[in-house]
Amino acid sequence: MRITNQDKKQGLIEVVPETIDDLWHLSHIVEVNDYVSTLTARRIQDNNSGKTRADRGVKKKFFLGIRVEKINFHKYTGMLRFTGIIESGPEDLIPLGSHHTINVQLNNSIRIKKIWNKWSLERLNQAIEASNRANEIIVAIEDNTTELGIIKQYGIDYIGPIIGDISGKQNIEKNRAQKVNEYYEDITKTLTQQKDIDKLIIIGPGFTKNGYYNYLEENYPKLAKKVILESTGAGGHAGIQEVLKNGLIESLSKDAKIAKEAALVNKLLEQIGKSSNTVTYGKKQVITASNMGAVEKLLVLEDLVRDKNIQNIMNTVENMGGVVTIISSQHDAGQQLKALGSLAAFLRYPI
């Protein structure tokens, strides 16, 4: 994400989203009743012209602004839509007061006018700082099946499964070696479709991960230099979630947002499982703890951040020296926090 224009007095910031992560951030930065505008194009028909229908009309570009009523983000399609009432634009081309949906496009600027609270600005800065980071990819490999997990700001993008035709009595040793190489090559072709790979974390329960690493060393030495091997009790989604929870990703990258969130929620669940009196969850309980100054770390599901009452709790915790972490709802840890009421806290002392 890039900021291309800013007017602090007007509360106006113009940004250019560059990745799906940026669209996700924008879906939580923009709130209902905010004003957004972008350059749009419409073909204006000349009904008096003698031209054929296919030739009629001139495409005109203009800025159109709406007062936001509805926000929709779909991570799988990479689409972000703002729907609302048109407040600005050329009156001869568009009917003011009617409804319109703005489809936010990557690499196209969008203007946002709003009351920028601390949390909105922090989120915007997160998106800007993350824009230059390279990809970190988890390769969860087993004998016949591999899944890739692309680490995003909002969660994990899963690719796969990639299936290898290896097992079976009909595969004699020579044929098996060929099948293994074909399997490894299929994985690598999928991997190399991702740009700017920084780290490649190869995980799995057996020795297949070692075999794949040896294959990379021999055939793709530059890629092999980015590899970290890690044993896990499972492959697939379960294996990827395992390394997110065990702190490996967090230790490898100070910017691994999802890993930090997963580790915090996992620690919370462990403390709850032990019936610890130094954690609490649920809105009522957390409000009580925050008012007492007992909250050391506050976990807030991102879906709640627009709530002014929740913002007050967050401000109270920070003013009393606590740390606030906003948890994405797009990954497993976020769903676990949601099941606990979307709000939880680690306490300085029992209450």
From Swiss-Prot:
GO biological process, one term: nonfunctional rRNA decay
Essential cofactor(s): a divalent metal cation
GO terms of molecular function: endonuclease activity; metal ion binding
EC category name: hydrolase
Keywords: Cytoplasm, Endonuclease, Hydrolase, Metal-binding, Nuclease
GO (cellular component) term, any one: cytoplasm
Localization of this protein: Cytoplasm
Pfam families recorded: eRF1_1, eRF1_2, eRF1_3
EC number: 3.1.-.-
Summary of subunit composition and partner proteins: Monomer.
Function: May function in recognizing stalled ribosomes, interact with stem-loop structures in stalled mRNA molecules, and effect endonucleolytic cleavage of the mRNA. May play a role in the release non-functional ribosomes and degradation of damaged mRNAs. Has endoribonuclease activity.
NCBIfam families, alphabetized: pelota
Family listed: Belongs to the eukaryotic release factor 1 family. Pelota subfamily.
Domain observations: The N-terminal domain has the RNA-binding Sm fold. It harbors the endoribonuclease activity.
Protein name: Protein pelota homolog
Native source organism of the sequence: Methanosphaera stadtmanae (strain ATCC 43021 / DSM 3091 / JCM 11832 / MCB-3)
Top-level taxonomy: Archaea, Methanobacteriati, Methanobacteriota, Methanomada group, Methanobacteria
